[in-house]
C-alpha cells in the first residue's frame, strides 16, 4: 500500500494571528519532530519520525538546498517514506530525465551506512518497476537534482500498471497545483511512501 500526504502554503499562512487580530493559542502537536536534533526534520514536509531501526537521509544539492529526505529502515532495508517540497522554481524543465540507457541508472545511495542496503539491486528483474517516490519529473531543474531521484533509497517496487497509471497521474496532478496556482499558493509539502510494518509488505 502506497500513500501520499500533501499540504500547501501561501504568503499569509505564517502570520501567527487569527482573523480577529488576536494571537492564537499554540496546540501541542504530537506529530512534531522539534525535539529531534536534526534541523531538517523540523521542515513542514516531514511526518512524525518512526525512529527505532530507521535513519534519516537528506539529500542536498551543491548549493546547499535540500532536494528531498528519506526515512530508511535499516533492518528491513526499505524506504518508509520520501518527503520533499515543490514550488515554481524547482519544477522548471531545464534538463532531460536521466536516460534509460544509463548503465548506472539506479545507483546506491552514497549516504547509506554500509549495512543498510542489499548488495545488489533487489528490483531489477523482479517483475516490478523502480517506483520513484520523489519523482524524476519534479526534479528537472538541474542535472544534480534529477540524478539524485534515481538513488535506490528513493524507490519502492511497483506493478507497472500502477506505476505508469494512477501513480503517474497523481504525480502530474500535484505539479498542476503549482503551475496553475502561480502566486496564490507558493509551496506544496509532499510525503509519499509504502506500508512496510508487516511481514510480506517489503522485499527480503
Residue ranges of model-derived segments:
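Domain-level detector for secreted/extracellular nuclease and nuclease-toxin modules, and
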Residues: 10-204
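C-terminal motif of bacterial Sec signal peptides marking the signal peptidase cleavage site
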Residues: 5-9
Amino acid at each position: 500500500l502506497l500513500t501520499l500526504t500533501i499540504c500547501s502554503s501561501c504568503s499569509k499562512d505564517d502570520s501567527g494571528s487569527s482573523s480577529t487580530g488576536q494571537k492564537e493559542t499554540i496546540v501541542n502537536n504530537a506529530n512534531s519532530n522539534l525535539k529531534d536534533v536534526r534541523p531538517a526534520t523540523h521542515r513542514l514536509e516531514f511526518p512524525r519520525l518512526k525512529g527505532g531501526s530507521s535513519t534519516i537521509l537528506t539529500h542536498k544539492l551543491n548549493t546547499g538546498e535540500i532536494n528531498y529526505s528519506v526515512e530508511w529502515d535499516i533492518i528491513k532495508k526499505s524506504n518508509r517514506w520520501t518527503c520533499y517540497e515543490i514550488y515554481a522554481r524547482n519544477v522548471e524543465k531545464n534538463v532531460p530525465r536521466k536516460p534509460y540507457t544509463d548503465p548506472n541508472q539506479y545507483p546506491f545511495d552514497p549516504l547509506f551506512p554500509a549495512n543498510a542496503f542489499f548488495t545488489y539491486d533487489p528490483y531489477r528483474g523482479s517483475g516490478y518497476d523502480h517506483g520513484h517516490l520523489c519523482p524524476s519529473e519534479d526534479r528537472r531543474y538541474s542535472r544534480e537534482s534529477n540524478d539524485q531521484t534515481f538513488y535506490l533509497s528513493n524507490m519502492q517496487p511497483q506493478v507497472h500498471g500502477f506505476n505508469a497509471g494512477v501513480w503517474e497521474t497523481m504525480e502530474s496532478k500535484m505539479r498542476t497545483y503549482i503551475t496553475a496556482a502561480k502566486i496564490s499558493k507558493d509551496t506544496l509539502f509532499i510525503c509519499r511512501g509504502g506500508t512496510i510494518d508487516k511481514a510480506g509488505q517489503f522485499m527480503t
